[in-house]
Amino acid sequence: MLKFMLDTNTCIFTIKNKPEHIRERFNLNTSRMCISSITLMELIYGAEKSLAPERNLAVVEGFISRLEVLDYDTQAAIHTGQIRAELARKGTPVGPYDQMIAGHAGSRGLVVVTNNLREFERIPGIRIEDWC
C-alpha cells in the first residue's frame, strides 16, 4: 500500500546518494513510495537540459523503474486548486509544481517526502516528512 510521494528534491538526493542515509530510507520503503507524473516531468527536464542528457535520462529511467508513477488526475487538480486558492488568500505563494505535487499527494492521502520544508510547510492540509 502506498504511503509516501517523493518530491523532486528527494528523488535527486536519492539518485545522487547524498546524504547517504536517504538511500537506506528509500530501500526500506520502496514498495510504499511513488512519485507524481509532475515529479517525473521535473526529473526529465533536468536530465534533458544537463550536459549529459543520455546518461542522465538512463539514470532517471532506472530510478523510476523501482517506483510507481501516479498520473496527475482530476482529483489532484481539484485538490491543487483548493490549495492554490488558500495560499492566495493568505498571501503565501508556493511554486506551481510544489502546489501540484502537494495537491496530488493530498488527493491520495499520501505523505510528501521533501526537504523543501520552507515551501511545503505553508501548504494547508498535507503531511510532510524530511528524510534528509
Swiss-Prot record:
Induction / repression: Induced by amino acid starvation and by chloramphenicol treatment.
Keyword vocabulary terms for this entry: Endonuclease, Hydrolase, Magnesium, Metal-binding, Nuclease, Toxin-antitoxin system
Phenotype when changing residue 7 to A: No inhibition of cell growth, no degradation of tRNA(fMet)
Residues annotated to bind Mg(2+): 7, 98
Free-text function comment from the UniProt entry: Toxic component of a type II toxin-antitoxin (TA) system. A site-specific tRNA-(fMet) endonuclease, it cleaves both charged and uncharged tRNA-(fMet) between positions 38 and 39 at the anticodon stem-loop boundary. Does not cleave tRNA(Met), tRNA(Arg2), tRNA(His), tRNA(Leu), tRNA(Phe) tRNA(Thr1), tRNA(Tyr) or tRNA(Val). Overexpression in E.coli inhibits translation, leads to loss of cell growth and degradation of tRNA(fMet), these effects are neutralized by expression of cognate antitoxin VapB.
Cofactor(s) essential for the protein: Mg(2+)
Enzyme Commission number, as recorded: 3.1.-.-
Catalytic class of the enzyme: hydrolase
PINc domain ranges (all copies): 5-131
Family: Belongs to the PINc/VapC protein family.
Pfam family, any one: PIN
Native source organism of the sequence: Salmonella typhimurium (strain LT2 / SGSC1412 / ATCC 700720)
Keyword set includes Isomerase: no
Subunit field text: Forms a complex with antitoxin VapB.
Protein name: tRNA(fMet)-specific endonuclease VapC
SUPFAM superfamilies cross-referenced by the UniProt entry: PIN domain-like
Gene from which the chain derives: vapC
An MF annotation (GO) of this entry: magnesium ion binding
Alphabetized InterPro entries for the sequence: PIN-like_dom_sf, PIN_dom, Type_II_TA_system_RNase, VapC_family
Record HAMAP family: VapC_Nob1
